[in-house]
Amino acid sequence: MSASSSKGKGKELATASPLPGPSSGSANPAASLSALWAYLLPALNHIVKSPTNTPDKAPAIDIGFYAGIHTACYNYFTSQSETKSSAQARTAEPSGTDLYEQLDKYYIDAAREVILGAPQDDSTLIHYIVPCFNRFSAGAMSVNRLLNYINRHYVRRAQDEDKGWLRLNDVLESVAKTITADDSREKISERLKEKRTDELKQWGYKPDGSGATMASAEACAEAASPPDRIISVSSLAHRRFRTEVFEPLLAVPVVKGTKAKNKKIPKATKTTGIPLPKGRLARAVKELLESKGGDEEERVRLVRDLAAALRLVGVRPDHPLRKRLDRFLQNV
């Protein structure tokens, strides 16, 4: 074996080393939320935050630890259900609500770490955000598989109870205009289904396409939903990256010197020459797109990855920055 191949193999082994689980003598992780969270947290931190040479692939955990987490989640959900009486079951929150909310808080903190580490220089912002998001998203997808029991047991039940990304109240007003007193329940259900399809089309769903476009569009629609909606574990992470990272970077700064009663941003005119203020990310994109020289292939890659990230976290297709990125990519 050559020195170069040996060196490469050593690096690969170091990168692929899975995280071992806790000692077998540990307390029952399903005994309480605090015990379960203490059991999960090292795995979450390893998958979501550990440094890696391949940002598009999350670090692995030991197969025994992986199986132990599945078992602990199952036992925790089961024990919650068994301890509730029939009367409590009708009024209490579904089992798993506390774990789901704890996971949401975890993603809030993880996303805030990203924004706190952002450079102040606009010229390097996109070079920082794109790999950070790719790493965060890879971890989110890995955690989604690891905690799929939450999706199957808690998220699906919540969606069946009209607590998902699209609720009856969201579509009732528009659908109600076309509903008559003679319409059957099946016909009303079909109208609601059509409304859902229209929403998914905004995120790239093609009715005559593969099921992959449906899954991709629904993931984006979930991430675009308000924080009170129950969505899949991966979309939960992407939604928090939007609320804690992208939205602050997209926010337009308040114009100083304007009167309190007039909060509107002045329009740019040829006579005044006053430019409209832009958010940090918009300024960074402008600088990237208008820069001369440099690595053109790298610039296109950054733009493509940023456009994909904005879509995946639920930034609307009609957002000016998304439209600008799409126009650029159409011409390359």
Q: At which residue positions do the language-model features occur?
A:
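Eukaryotic scaffold/interaction segments
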Residues: 1-332
